Amino acid sequence: MQEQYRPEEIESKVQLHWDEKRTFEVTEDESKEKYYCLSMLPYPSGRLHMGHVRNYTIGDVIARYQRMLGKNVLQPIGWDAFGLPAEGAAVKNNTAPAPWTYDNIAYMKNQLKMLGFGYDWSRELATCTPEYYRWEQKFFTELYKKGLVYKKTSAVNWCPNDQTVLANEQVIDGCCWRCDTKVERKEIPQWFIKITAYADELLNDLDKLDHWPDTVKTMQRNWIGRSEGVEITFNVNNYDNTLTVYTTRPDTFMGCTYLAVAAGHPLAQKAAENNPELAAFIDECRNTKVAEAEMATMEKKGVDTGFKAVHPLTGEEIPVWAANFVLMEYGTGAVMAVPGHDQRDYEFASKYGLNIKPVILAADGSEPDLSQQALTEKGVLFNSGEFNGLDHEAAFNAIADKLTAMGVGERKVNYRLRDWGVSRQRYWGAPIPMVTLEDGTVMPTPDDQLPVILPEDVVMDGITSPIKADPEWAKTTVNGMPALRETDTFDTFMESSWYYARYTCPQYKEGMLDSKAANYWLPVDIYIGGIEHAIMHLLYFRFFHKLMRDAGMVNSDEPAKQLLCQGMVLADAFYYVGENGERNWVSPVDAIVERDEKGRIVKAKDAAGHELVYTGMSKMSKSKNNGIDPQVMVERYGADTVRLFMMFASPADMTLEWQESGVEGANRFLKRVWKLVYEHTAKGDVATLNVDALTEDQKALRRDVHKTIAKVTDDIGRRQTFNTAIAAIMELMNKLAKAPTDGEQDRALMQEALLAVVRMLNPFTPHICFTLWQELKGEGDIDNAPWPVADEKAMVEDSTLVVVQVNGKVRAKITVPVDATEEQVRERAGQEHLVAKYLDGVTVRKVIYVPGKLLNLVVG
């Protein structure tokens, strides 16, 4: 064994061994308990970042630990390979998305191997291959036949100059990112999957997810947004149709003073025929981004349509306004406004001088003060005719019942959740397998024509999708008749909604899933990824599992038993102000810093001499240039050091602050472990441990070893507090470093301890542990070694510490056998000089003894 720890030599050697032995390849084995550990698959952007490294290290630690428990562990990896960035990169680099993507996959695969992750590479998949997306296309056609897929027009961001649809992130300040033209809202036909048909089940089954974070479940509950309310119909004077609105607060209905409709509503369109101001407003609304988040923060605007609706209960006429905060695609495209008791309605009414009528009393029973804001709390009604004096629930029911009896109201359950629009007007995605015949009939692509393959050898102009630009690509024949293919592609959330299931049978050619394999491995035991995926991906992931269950492919209701959302990785961020006042962000690697005595940064500059402004720790990002390249760190310190720091610096679900000093600390610790094993093995063979012949000191050290095993097992397995597990191993290492190594049993005990330490560290730092296990002559490869088991007998204390007090004041602490009687403890206490001094010449009037803990002698 060499004296120095050289990760650059051992890590590549160990990785080659894993590859050659196919150590982490697994198959179904009914005789073993399975464990499926999955980290969210990466987008092949070109290089791994620290967020990836953290996610995948957590997964690998759990997978390796479960493997050492003797389970059949599946840990696969693949590539979420379709998506918009590839199109941008292709245009920029004058290539096609496919070669750019495949080059990135090859590069990032090497980076993953360099970090020592124990993946079953035989199951690797890339979602952009026809072998993968063919089954998604087939499944989509089956959903269509079941009535779960439909087409309708829906609003998109449209660039009139490029004649193309833009994703929300391609709209910057209301303009096209490419040509700076003002973006419009445009209605175009798109494909939808009926996720709303599963809304109740998606909501109710959240209660089954005991091991998902409450934050994620709450976000999904709110996103699904089930509400109980009343749908109310209003007559409108001089208008051919009625207006229907939905409210969850019928108790406030007597305070409704106006209605608001979307700019695209037929009533607004009709009113605009003779109203130039309204027509201009409708035009302006066309330029509103379709993202819901934008809607929440933008300025609320409106124009009076001139139409008057009739309040069904009071008979009063109330104005109908067109407003930019009402969307046609949400609900009926019309809302009722109660400005006294809804803040948005209040702000709009205040801005345009509309009537504000209070109908709910304040908590103290007084009339509410509406001079500054609306009263949004529930309460007792007033100013509401026959409903005065009713509380929220009674008023809800009374008003709902009255509207129903009049034929103008109906109780309804509503959902905030909308059906999933899966059409994207992009090129780099899976083609949607639908065709249109010459007579206008729309139908699924026949099975014998699947997959509909996306051509990869294309030229990107950055404007139009190559399959839309090439009229020949769309032409096909179905049942002998000419037909046109759909040129939209799937939302890339489609691919990431079922990949976890395909990992169980990636080579299966008879269908989407081999049910036998899928049902052996599924559900996933632990799924690891960022909380930013809480609603979109994690909801579609759950939805797809239910769709596959109902298609008879899987027999479970939910895709993953446990969800672990890892925290973000933060790093120092610095900038200097350029000549034009712009911020130039400087990498923390290039910042020369001065710190105060507490280690805080007080001054910084870069190599060019710019004075840097330090903005604190923030999420590693390209925009702030504060990402740290994992590859550089691995080359400098080794993969094991980077992995150990990642797991030690912070609890897995909290933010992690990147500190190179911490990385250096992790590296020093591994050097200490190496040194201790080196010194131990240099002394030659070791005798067998004889636990009955150990001295008290040896027993105490062995007790520490086994208590550490018990703690680390609990920390990794049950609590998943990996940082405290590492801290416990470090503490034990400090004790081992000080332990005597001269006697035969000293060395035998050290051998037992080091074999345990190396196995406990193995999930975190597998390369060094693989090597040290061999040097310690552990049986077989450590990858197949069992997790150490704490010896209950070794952990039993044979002595205990008793605090001795005289008149309630501590005078000594004594060590006594655990089975010592009160008499023996008193006798032993009396031998202590400090105790004897206070007992001299006095009478012990009372003895308070708490066995094994406290002896209090009351004297006088």
Swiss-Prot record:
The keyword ATP-binding applies. GO terms for molecular function: aminoacyl-tRNA deacylase activity; ATP binding; leucine-tRNA ligase activity. This is Leucine--tRNA ligase. It is found in: Cytoplasm. Its EC number is 6.1.1.4. NCBIfam families: leuS_bact (TIGR00396). Belongs to the class-I aminoacyl-tRNA synthetase family. It catalyses: tRNA(Leu) + L-leucine + ATP = L-leucyl-tRNA(Leu) + AMP + diphosphate. A motif ('HIGH' region) lies at residues 42-52. It holds the Pfam family Anticodon_1. GO terms for cellular component: cytosol. GO terms for biological process: leucyl-tRNA aminoacylation. Its main location: cytoplasm. ATP binds at K622. SUPFAM superfamilies: Anticodon-binding domain of a subclass of class I aminoacyl-tRNA synthetases, Nucleotidylyl transferase, ValRS/IleRS/LeuRS editing domain. Keywords: Aminoacyl-tRNA synthetase, ATP-binding, Cytoplasm, Ligase, Nucleotide-binding, Protein biosynthesis. A motif ('KMSKS' region) lies at residues 619-623. It comes from Escherichia coli O9:H4 (strain HS). Disulfide bonds: none annotated.
